[in-house]
C-alpha cells in the first residue's frame, strides 16, 4: 500500500499521522500535485492529494475517504464505536476540515497579484477561522483527548488543522484559547506529529 501526498498538504498529513499512530505498513511517496511532472492526475482525476493505492492500479482519493479506509483497517478504528462518541468525533473533524479549507482559501488570496487581491475575502476567511477557534474552545471539555479517553480522528484532524493555521496564518490564537492551546501542545508532541511536520517550520507551543 502506498500513500501519495505533498509534505505541505494538511489533507495528506492527516493520513500520514494516522498511519504512524496505527503502525500501518504503508509507503509514503511525496508528489507535488502542482508540479508539471506530477503523477497525481493519473491516479486521481481531481488532481489532489492524498491518494491511497490499496492495490496495483486501485486508488482511493479525497482525505475523508482515505482516512476512513485507513482507520477501519484490521477492524481496529480510532473512531469511537458508540453513537454519541462517533458523532462527537465527526463534529470535531468537520470543524477541523473547515479550518483547513478557510486557511487555504486565505493563503491563495494572498498569493494573487496585489492589485487583484480581495481584502474582503481574506477578512471573511479570517472570520471563519476565528469563529471555528471560538467554537472549539467552547466545546473542549478538558482532558488529554477531545473525545473520550483515547486518541481519535478528532484529535488528529484538529491537531493538524491548528498546526496548519500556525504555519499558514500565524497569529496569537492561544491567548484567547489557553485550554485548547494546552491540549494542542500535548497532541502535537506525539511522534506522529513530530515526524510529519513540514520541513522548515518549528512547532509552536
Predicted regions and their residues:
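Short polybasic/polar patches that bind polyanions
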Residues: 20, 167, 189
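Non-transmembrane alpha-helical segments in soluble domains
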Residues: 67, 71, 90-93, 133, ...
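Active-site-flanking alpha-helical
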Residues: 71, 161-162, 197
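Long hydrophobic alpha-helical segments typical of transmembrane helices together
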Residues: 175-205
